[in-house]
């Protein structure tokens, strides 16, 4: 039809017929049943690769500087993909980002004595702060533990200006 009736030449290497769910167009894909525009999984993967560079342990720096870099990436990315308004996907990404930031704080504190002092300063009682600081677990585990979520709740990150992907909905 395209070549005979419309007299157009098609590039067989680039052209294909497939389901809408498999399509990737400008970073978007389409829901199979509803046809809504969704962020393509490859676009999420590219965002996570960018975030991985920001969360690199060897970089050093303050939490505020990291927040600034994150906000530039997240705000631009979310503005571009504003047509996708799924709550669960963006909420999970927000939780993942906050966990990474808590991990960086845990690593920055370095010593159990510092960790205990800082946790106590942020509202944990003495024994719980001591127990959490000396638990012998890694930074990633501690970043999702109850003591770090109590010390650094969502309100802490809002107060320090971290951009929320979910708030854009």
Q: Each predicted region: which residue ranges?
A:
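Non-catalytic terminal/accessory segments
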Residues: 1-169
